[in-house]
From Swiss-Prot:
Keyword Nucleus: no
Source organism of the structure: Vibrio vulnificus (strain CMCP6)
UniProt protein name: Phosphoglycolate phosphatase
Biological classification of the source: Bacteria, Pseudomonadati, Pseudomonadota, Gammaproteobacteria, Vibrionales
Keyword Hydrolase applies: yes
Keywords: Carbohydrate metabolism, Hydrolase, Magnesium, Metal-binding
Enzyme class: hydrolase
Gene expressing this chain: gph
GO biological process: carbohydrate metabolic process; DNA repair; glycolate biosynthetic process
Length: 228
């Protein structure tokens, strides 16, 4: 990959563009308590997110990153349904964009890059969140965690984007905050841009060996915008 080649930039959402944990934590706490289990704190949920809502709820019920195998499918399904309801009720009022996100997306959009969103978040929640924070119009494609049979780190969503837009792996960049984002990029054969903030279970993003590591999304501009 060279900077001149990049045509499409795929972004993760939670932990990359949006700090959504405050709302997720409220919903997870309410859901676990509703089924008779101990509640969870925001600090716990920061560790549990990143692999989709089913995994988040399994971890919350287990009070651990490792899901208790004795939890029944019925219980997990009930808690997940409650979680979805409670999360919808939060109105996403506690979530907020990270610094420089809106400005960076605007500049990339104006520069002519194709921008896509590839998140493990359930699809039904994504449009409202993007609209609420004023960034929906920047994305040509919005792919949720249930858009395909597999979630990141499976590359199926990234492969779909490359096929749709008729581009090569060298022409796409994946931007994210977790090893699932970096592994998805590696599995798709494209470069990755890893952010040091966000949700990565306490593991430095550099450990996943992304092609670029940054503390701010604004640093992405230095990677993809090449002066004439």
């Amino acid at each position: 990959m060279t900077q001149q080649e990049i045509k499409l930039i795929a972004f993760d959402l939670d932990g990359t563009l949006l700090d959504s944990v405050p709302d997720l934590a409220v919903a997870a706490d309410q859901a676990t308590r509703a089924v008779g289990f101990p509640g969870v704190t925001e600090l716990q949920v920061r560790d549990y997110v990143g692999n989709g809502a089913d995994i988040l709820i399994g971890r919350a019920l287990s009070q651990s990153l490792t899901i208790n195998p004795e939890l029944s499918d019925e219980l997990r399904a009930q808690a997940r349904e409650l979680f979805d309801d409670f999360y919808q009720q939060t109105g996403h009022k506690l979530s907020h964009l990270y610094p420089t996100v809106k400005e960076t997306l605007k500049e990339l959009h104006q520069a002519g890059f194709t921008l896509a969103l590839v998140t493990n978040k359930p699809s039904k929640f994504v449009p409202d969140v993007l609209q609420q924070h004023g960034i929906a119009d920047y994305f040509v494609d919005v792919l949720g965690g249930d858009s395909f049979p597999e979630k990141k780190p499976n590359p199926i969503a990234l492969n779909w984007l490359m096929e749709k837009h008729q581009i090569q792996p060298t022409e796409m960049l994946m931007v994210g905050d977790s090893k699932n984002d970096i592994l998805a990029a590696k599995n798709a054969g494209c470069a990755s841009f890893g952010l040091t903030y966000g949700y990565n279970h306490g593991e430095p993003i550099a450990a996943s060996e992304p092609d670029f590591v940054a503390d701010s999304l604004a640093q992405l501009l230095d990677v993809v915008l090449v002066s004439a």
